[in-house]
Amino acid sequence: PEITVTGTKLKNGMIAKVGSGSFIWPVPNYKYVSRWMGNGHRGADICAAYGTPILASDSGTIIAAGWHYSYGNYVEIDHGNGYKTLYAHMSAQAVHVGDVVEQGQVIGYVGNTGNSFGNHCHFEMYYNNALISARNVFPDM
């Protein structure tokens, strides 16, 4: 049997957008990461001013957009090539489930929602449903 997490599988009628597999940093001009993945922390915390646009790291389809007790306002993108990315603690989302987005498109805005202490974008990356470190994809950050 196939096991999926609710909200992470394309629904009937949704068209998958396949990403390039080449990622861009989701918060341009903000390079400071206060915390990388490790010790129970699942992503990179990119410090930025409240309301700063958050960009899709690659093209794909929005598979989740909503509220989570820990993530606050968040968006998840399926890039259709085994990769998924998740962006959390947004002040607001700019997309909805089922939307097809292009690399560099605004998907939301930096905030401080959910289990958060200060404005930042929490950024997670997955390959074949396994969590991977953004530090390996962006070694110069």
How should these model regions be labeled?
Residues 1-20:
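Non-catalytic extracellular/periplasmic "stalk"
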Residues 19-141:
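Catalytic cores of peptidoglycan-degrading enzymes
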